């Protein structure tokens, strides 16, 4: 057995073999270890469905690659991958479900995923066994279907071997040790004894520069060995196989196989299986399993079937396929399928570790295996994937995440597979968990909360006496009933003042003798002078945008960094690793995460100075907030009543405003003072949805939408924040990329009852030329607004395009950056 490799992949399911294949194809010396046999985990009992349907941009690309890749495997390896291209039909019982499919259609169009819409009559004419009288329609993917999980895994394994991969079975990993340049992986030979797989006395060590874990149901053991948290915990998934259906058998004499049928409103999928049907429900109350480890006795095993739990779904299958009523039950499966709290797998660098890569938590592992291997190999070999993989990054979960949280959220995620996935969806499990001190005060004033990175923060403020189900019932693919409240909040910031809770912001202190030199290299903008702030970006080594920072310079070698609240662990990990790498060159650097030490209120609007003037304690309170003493883009320590505040004159809404960073234990006092003063000046409490609209009126980019690892700051049209006179990480790579596409702001004459969500395709003469990354409503222009990426030649002011919403085309025009108050007069106003 080899003992030294470039990359070691741990786990021989579909995901692990897909990764090994693509690493070897990219030229890396790769070994794959499997503790049992290939496919012996969840792969063996997977139903093998290959749904192209997914609302996520990155995941859609992963699924699309897999489907195309699997079709090519036989030609390369000589092994039939068992791919049945029967298509996939997603039916809709409600208008809301059809709205969901139309929004998905926009995502699919941006990724070039072919699909069709069908009427109930078209469905019935083509597949007469399907009852359609209560359907509104369907969306059909003719190019996907299902695959034999064992066959496709073996085909990928053969392809991997052809590219030089060594596959070793019956070896269990027992330890990982990082030497500073490689991993030493301790392994033990597993042997069969009495039907169980047990460790033997034979051990070995593998030296690997890189390690990828794709350990499926064993992710908690992997987490323990690595000393990290991995929120990948399996949930029971049942499916049943019926006896042959005589009417189906008769139909098949003259017709091809049915597509995979999905009745999302009934929470199930069905496909043909040897003259009968497979029913796979996603029912409520499916329990999480293996919260801490998989028992040694559990191999290719299953759990007892719980028919009572899926009775509703079974009866609804009979309703949709009446011929199935007389068929008996032939077989059943109830096995563990891994989930994560948000349903996306964990793909990318492990938190806090070097050259350790995770590929865990796949609930649709067969669908994702090929694409994950392709894009993860790009990340490992080239430094970044060709698209932004941040939505799958393991560090989207921080150290606050516990096993109990992951288990409960994973159960919820399983039960939500087929619910309506509104863009304004907020799930209720494990909430509230992380809250700012003012949570109860905000709730008493009508706050309806959303959860980001475990934090509950206001999305908008509804009626004070709203029932518990108000927010859930407000959701829509069009303008939900929350929309009017967000409009009033946005108007308040433009006309009077608004107060936003931004406590969830990520906050770091960077200081020490090497801090200035490090941050000058780490970010692309010039560093601010003491007492001033700037907006800047940390780049990846490949020149794309990794993190957006507001930097406050507290002293010659002390800086306060503020970044997006959703990405605390993601930002901290990169910041620390880069600082560790550069400390020998630049000198000692301290990094402190102070996120939970400081609360933040953002006050903005024409009356914001008047409100703060009532509270400020200063020898000359009339001038304390003037442009002379407190200019735009500066920071000062002030006192608001009895609360010390680190105030920053900046506003994400494009109005006169300040961020008020305060000791978190004084938040309720400060909140009460601001409310009392603000009530005299028309101030409203404002949530994140109104803020999102307002920042688009100013063309302020947001991380995760306009900003990410698939575009450079220059492509994001942020040239003014890039100092090309200095050296910084990723500079040359950024310049070498050129301008492949360009970010711009667009005003949209859209439908009367809907706004774009930032998922829609942009077209010129019927040809896709870009996509929206953000969307919403503009109170300033009284129409829809959006931001997105287009071909560089089309990013000019006045360019007319089209956007597709609800299968209709609407007029779009490219406008100047910051179309509202383009000279920033309102932000700079004196007083």
What are these regions, as identified by a protein language model?
Residues 2-15, 31:
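Beta1/beta-strand and adjacent pyrophosphate-binding region of the FAD-binding site
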Residues 72, 93-169, 174-189, 193, ...:
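Flavin (FAD/FMN) cofactor-binding and adjacent substrate-gating region
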Residues 24-44:
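Glycine-rich FAD pyrophosphate-binding loop
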Residues 149, 265, 274, 296-433:
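C-terminal catalytic lobe of FAD-dependent flavoproteins
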Residues 47-52, 88-90, 227-253, 312, ...:
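Central beta-strand plus flanking loop segment that forms part of the substrate or channel wall
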Residues 48-126, 265-270, 275-278, 411-425, ...:
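Dinucleotide-binding Rossmann-like beta1-alpha1 core, especially the glycine-rich loop
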Residues 18, 176-303, 312-315, 320, ...:
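Flavin-dependent oxidoreductases
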Residues 387-388, 393-831:
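Glycine/proline-enriched, intrinsically flexible loops and inter-domain linkers
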């Amino acid at each position: 057995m080899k003992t030294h490799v470039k990359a070691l992949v741990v786990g021989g399911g579909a995901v692990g073999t897909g990764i090994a294949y693509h690493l070897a194809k990219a030229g890396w010396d790769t070994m794959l270890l499997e503790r049992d046999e290939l496919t012996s985990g969840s792969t063996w009992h997977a139903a093998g469905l290959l749904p192209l349907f997914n609302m996520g941009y990155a995941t859609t690309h992963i699924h699309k690659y897999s489907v195309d890749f699997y079709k090519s495997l036989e030609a390369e390896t000589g092994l039939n991958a068992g791919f049945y291209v029967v298509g996939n039909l997603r039916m809709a019982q409600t208008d809301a479900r059809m709205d969901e499919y139309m929004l998905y259609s926009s995502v699919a169009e941006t990724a070039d995923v072919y699909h069709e819409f069908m009427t109930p009559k078209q469905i019935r004419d083509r597949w007469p066994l399907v009852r359609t009288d209560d359907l509104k329609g369907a969306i059909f993917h003719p190019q996907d279907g299902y695959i034999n999980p064992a066959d496709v895994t073996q085909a990928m394994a053969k392809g991997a071997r052809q590219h030089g991969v060594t596959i070793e079975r019956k070896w269990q990993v027992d330890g990982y040790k990082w030497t500073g340049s490689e991993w030493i992986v301790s392994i033990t030979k597993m042997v069969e004894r009495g039907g169980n797989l047990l460790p033997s006395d034979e051990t070995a060590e593998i030296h690997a520069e890189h390690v990828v874990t794709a350990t499926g149901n064993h992710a908690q053991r992997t987490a323990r060995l690595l000393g990290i948290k991995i929120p990948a915990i399996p949930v029971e998934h049942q499916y049943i196989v019926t006896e042959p259906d005589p009417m189906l058998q008769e139909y098949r004499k003259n017709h091809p196989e049915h597509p995979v049928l999905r009745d999302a409103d009934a929470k199930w999928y069905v496909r043909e299986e040897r003259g009968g049907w497979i029913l796979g429900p996603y029912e409520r109350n499916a329990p999480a399993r293996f919260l801490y480890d998989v028992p040694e006795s559990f191999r290719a095993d299953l759990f007892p079937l719980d028919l009572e739990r899926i009775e509703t779904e079974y009866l609804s299958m009979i309703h949709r396929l009446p011929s199935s009523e007389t068929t008996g039950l032939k077989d059943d499966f109830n096995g563990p399928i891994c989930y994560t709290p948000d349903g996306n797998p964990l793909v990318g660098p492990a938190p806090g570790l070097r050259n350790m890569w995770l590929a865990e938590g796949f609930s649709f592992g067969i669908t994702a295996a090929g694409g994950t291997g392709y894009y993860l190999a790009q990340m490992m070999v080239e430094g970044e994937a060709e698209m932004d993989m941040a939505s799958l990054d393991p560090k989207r979960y921080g150290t606050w995440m516990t096993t109990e949280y992951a288990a409960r959220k994973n159960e919820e995620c399983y039960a939500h597979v087929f619910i309506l996935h509104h863009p304004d969806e907020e799930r209720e499990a494990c909430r509230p968990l992380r809250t700012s001190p003012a949570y109860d005060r905000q709730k008493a004033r009508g706050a309806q909360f959303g959860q980001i990175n475990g934090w509950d923060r206001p999305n908008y403020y509804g009626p004070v006496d709203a029932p518990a189900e108000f927010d859930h019932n407000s959701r829509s693919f069009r303008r939900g009933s929350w929309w009017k409240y967000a409009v009033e909040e946005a108007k308040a910031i433009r006309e009077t003042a608004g107060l936003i809770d931004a406590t969830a912001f990520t906050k770091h202190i960077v200081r020490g003798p090497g801090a200035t030199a490090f941050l000058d290299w780490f970010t692309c903008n010039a560093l601010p002078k003491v007492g001033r702030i700037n907006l800047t970006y940390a780049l990846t080594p490949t020149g794309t945008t990794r993190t957006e920072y507001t930097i406050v310079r507290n002293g010659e070698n002390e800086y306060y960094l503020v970044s997006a609240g959703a990405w605390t662990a993601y930002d901290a990990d990169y910041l620390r690793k880069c600082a560790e790498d550069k400390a020998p060159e630049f000198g000692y650097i301290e990094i402190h995460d102070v996120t939970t030490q400081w609360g933040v209120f953002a006050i903005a609007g024409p009356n914001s100075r008047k409100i703060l003037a009532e509270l400020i304690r200063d020898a000359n309170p009339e001038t304390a907030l003037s442009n002379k003493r407190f200019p735009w883009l500066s920071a000062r320590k002030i006192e608001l009543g009895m609360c010390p505040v680190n105030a920053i004159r900046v506003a994400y809404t494009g109005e006169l405003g300040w961020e008020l960073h305060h000791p978190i234990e004084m938040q309720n006092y400060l909140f009460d003072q601001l409310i009392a003063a603000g009530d005299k000046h028309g101030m409203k409490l404002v949530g994140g949805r109104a803020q999102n609209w307002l920042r688009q009126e100013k063309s302020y980019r947001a991380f995760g939408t306009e900003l990410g690892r698939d575009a450079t700051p220059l492509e994001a049209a942020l040239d003014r924040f890039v100092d090309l006179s200095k050296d910084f990480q990723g500079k040359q790579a950024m310049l070498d990329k050129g301008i492949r596409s360009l970010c711009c702001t667009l005003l949209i004459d859209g439908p009367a009852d809907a706004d774009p969500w930032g998922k829609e395709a942009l077209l010129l003469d019927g040809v896709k030329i870009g996509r929206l990354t953000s969307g919403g409503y503009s109170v300033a222009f009284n129409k829809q607004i959006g931001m997105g990426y287009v071909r560089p030649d089309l990013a000019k002011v006045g360019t007319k395009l089209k956007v597709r919403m609800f299968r209709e085309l609407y007029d779009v025009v490219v406008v100047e950056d910051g179309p509202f108050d383009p000279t920033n007069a309102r932000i700079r106003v004196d007083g």
